[in-house]
Amino acid sequence: MRRLTDDWSNTPDASVGLITTTLGASRRSPAALLLIGFVSGALATLTFHQGIIWVLSALGALQGSAYSWRPVEPFGVPQVLNLAFWGGLWGCVFALIADRFPRSWPLWLAGLLFGAIAPTVVGWFVIAPLRGQPVAQGFEPARMWVGPVINGAYGLGTAVFYAILQRWAWAGSRW
């Protein structure tokens, strides 16, 4: 998505650009941006995130199962749907900051780095202690690599779906 100023800064009459930007605002509203981010994140969880878990499990590099329907407390929601919900929320965060990455970066790279860093750091230093687990997987490299790999795949998928849905929703995406 282009920055607001990009829509009108190159027009000879700034007021014409401002009107165009205002008229287009309904399609580019924050709610629409968040919806695209949420759907992108949820779809990325169901495909890229769970897909890489399935591949790593099949290779024997990870103990766990993809697409688990095991109930998650406190509401008993199936794990895969719980993950898709949280992936959708992370997709909203990505949608809000996607335009802040350097313009020289491809969106897939921004998504990959976002996924590998943001959800992983929160998981290590916020979620794990709340669950009574060791911070950052106990700082054991043999266990630490899993988070950035799985979440990096998630971020890549979020960026892919974000670009597709953004183009579908409105023309003029920067990617």
Model regions and ranges:
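Juxtamembrane/disordered regions of integral membrane proteins
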Residues: 2-175
